[in-house]
């Protein structure tokens, strides 16, 4: 925790360059070996900061009755043992608002740190890591709303990607592009919006798949044709001076 606190202090002090292991250990008056006893590198420290907060957050009594999720032991992740996601199921709905609100408080309480690491090329692309982390549970959320109905994996992926980007894309936007306080009272009832909308997306896409089939849904069977520009002859003049 000392490494995490020191790193989050140093990053805003040096916003245009990467804080190194040497600088971090010098700040704490410890040798580099001590750092490497805990972390492989600065990137793994950044991941731990975020994951450790989520794990600690989920220990709160608010989440006692929630279904916690960890990564599988064979996942390509430095901290698979730390829970990072939780679900509350209620009458066929996923009520995720309190989870996302509690998570956003961590970002808000460390706004300067996250505004830098989300926008700087000096560090691990933490946003990409977060998207990759949450896509699998969001896919499971889509399947929960399907309730046993069959849907092609490519459509499940589309819905999960759309909504995970909606949640975390909005958060990153606020922390890199605006100075707005994200916990406004006016939107307090909308923290579950992504999963409310996800249910509607599942119903809409399932209806389309069922009615027309996946080939029709994606635009007639066969491979997707990439746009290669308009052919010149389509715009040649007709005999009467009009464009064809």
PLM features per residue range, with description:
Residues 1-8, 12, 17-21, 29, ...:
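An amphipathic alpha-helix adjacent to DNA-recognition modules
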Residues 26:
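Alpha-helical residues within the helix-turn-helix
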Residues 139, 143, 164-244:
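C-terminal peripheral helix-coil segments that are non-catalytic and often amphipathic
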């Amino acid at each position: 925790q000392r490494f995490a606190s020191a790193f989050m202090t140093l990053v805003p002090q040096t916003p245009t360059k990467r804080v190194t292991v040497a600088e971090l250990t010098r700040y704490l008056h410890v040798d580099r070996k001590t750092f490497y006893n805990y972390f492989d590198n600065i990137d793994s420290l950044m991941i731990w900061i975020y994951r450790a907060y989520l794990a600690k957050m989920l220990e709160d009594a608010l989440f006692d009755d929630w279904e916690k999720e960890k990564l599988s032991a064979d996942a390509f992740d430095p901290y698979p043992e730390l829970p990072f996601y939780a679900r509350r199921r209620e009458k066929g709905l996923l009520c995720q608002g309190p989870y996302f609100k509690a998570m956003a408080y961590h970002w808000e309480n460390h706004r300067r740190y996250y505004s830098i690491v989300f926008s700087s090329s000096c560090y691990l692309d933490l946003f990409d890591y977060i998207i990759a982390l949450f896509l699998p549970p969001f896919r499971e959320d889509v399947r929960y709303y399907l309730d046993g109905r069959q849907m092609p994996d490519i459509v499940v992926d589309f819905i999960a990607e759309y909504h995970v980007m909606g949640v975390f894309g909005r958060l990153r936007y606020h922390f890199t592009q605006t100075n707005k306080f994200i916990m406004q009272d006016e939107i307090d009832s909308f923290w579950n919006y992504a999963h409310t909308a996800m249910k509607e997306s599942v119903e809409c896409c399932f209806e389309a798949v069922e009615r027309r089939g996946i080939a029709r849904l994606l635009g007639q069977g066969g491979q997707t044709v990439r746009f290669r520009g308009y052919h010149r002859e389509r715009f040649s003049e007709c005999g009467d001076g009009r464009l064809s």
